[in-house]
């Protein structure tokens, strides 16, 4: 019984220690297919390597939040950091700018990464 209590306490201590670890998110913005003006595509924002799990991600068109956005389930890597994919349909053209804005406890202000059509 005492052995079980010690093991349980060690597990609880290790889990509580995970909350103290903080890692800033890595943000990648890309399209599913090479960009062609006037051709429908998908805009993706892959956010990875962050901890804790609370995060806010917005896809932007000309600085304004895109409302019709979907995302994957929150998942975690072997190192217990988290990752997500946000995506939406879009049709690129010469004038519109697209970006991904992320808010996380590790960032003093939200970070915005622009989509580069040549990537």
From Swiss-Prot:
This protein's assembly is summarised as: Heterodimer of an alpha chain and a beta chain. Beta-2-microglobulin is the beta-chain of major histocompatibility complex class I molecules.
Q: InterPro entries from the entry?
A: B2Microglobulin, Ig-like_dom, Ig-like_dom_sf, Ig-like_fold, Ig/MHC_CS, Ig_C1-set, MHC/Immunoglobulin
What protein name applies here?
Beta-2-microglobulin
Q: Name one GO biological process term.
A: immune response
Disulphide connectivity of cysteines: 45-100
Gene3D superfamilies in the cross-refs: Immunoglobulins
The gene is: B2M
PROSITE patterns in the record = IG_LIKE, IG_MHC
Q: Which UniProt keywords apply?
A: Disulfide bond, Immunity, Immunoglobulin domain, MHC I, Secreted, Signal
> Which species is the source of this protein?
Aotus nancymaae (Ma's night monkey)
Any one Pfam family match given in the protein's UniProt record, by short name: C1-set
Signal peptide span per the entry?
A: 1-20
Q: Which GO terms describe its cellular component?
A: extracellular region; MHC class I protein complex
Recorded family membership? Belongs to the beta-2-microglobulin family.
Xref: SUPFAM superfamilies: Immunoglobulin
Mainly localized where?
A: secreted
List locations, semicolon-separated.
Secreted
Q: Where is the Ig-like C1-type domain?
A: 25-114
User: What does this gene product do?
Assistant: Component of the class I major histocompatibility complex (MHC). Involved in the presentation of peptide antigens to the immune system.
Does the UniProt entry include the keyword Disulfide bond? yes
């Amino acid at each position: 019984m005492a052995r079980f209590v010690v093991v349980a306490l060690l597990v609880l201590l290790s889990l509580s220690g995970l909350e103290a670890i903080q890692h800033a998110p890595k943000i990648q913005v890309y399209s599913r297919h090479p960009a062609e003006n006037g051709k429908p595509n998908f805009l993706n924002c892959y956010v990875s390597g962050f901890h804790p799990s609370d995060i806010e991600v917005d896809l932007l068109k000309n600085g304004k939040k895109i409302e019709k956005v979907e995302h994957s389930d929150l998942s975690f890597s072997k190192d217990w950091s988290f990752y997500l994919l946000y995506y939406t349909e879009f049709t690129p053209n010469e004038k519109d700018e697209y970006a991904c804005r992320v808010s996380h406890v590790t960032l003093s202000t939200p970070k915005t990464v622009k989509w580069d059509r040549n990537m």
